[in-house]
Amino acid sequence: GVCGELNCKPLTSVVLQGLFSHLMVGVNMVNAPTIAKQRDITIREVRSDEAGAYQTLISLLVVTENQSRSIRGTLFNDEPRVVEIKDIPIDAKLGPNMLYITNRDKPGLIGNLGSVLGDAGVNIATFHLGRADEGGNAIALIEVDGTPPEAVMDAVCELENVVQAIAMRF
């Protein structure tokens, strides 16, 4: 779509900065491409003018020796939205404080999660769900008011059918 015509270098630099900032200090969008090159990390920018379901769609695939992760995003009314994570469709508007939860798609998870957060005084602002298939892998992106304390995140991780729970701040 429209993104196929754009200069992707600044976006690539910001993505690299975000990936490296969790591993080292002093990373910025100017030096991130150089750090990638020094570490023999292969970067491929692929563009397509092919029209699809979205007028603009940006996909990110990170492949390591141990795993691969993917995410796709677009713009709806000039607001960024996540539309796919690890091949699981989702429609999520991001907020400043988010919980990223991977889980098995089983009954009771949403209620139990809401109870843990509510009992701790953590307010849910938005709740976005996606699943691969019935009873299979699922993802929740939840906007909350404030960053949940570590003890709350530990309680979320201990819920039945939760595989992983991460607090994110944007």
List each language-model region with its residue ranges.
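A conserved regulatory-domain signal marking ACT and ACT-like small-molecule sensing domains
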Residues: 1-170
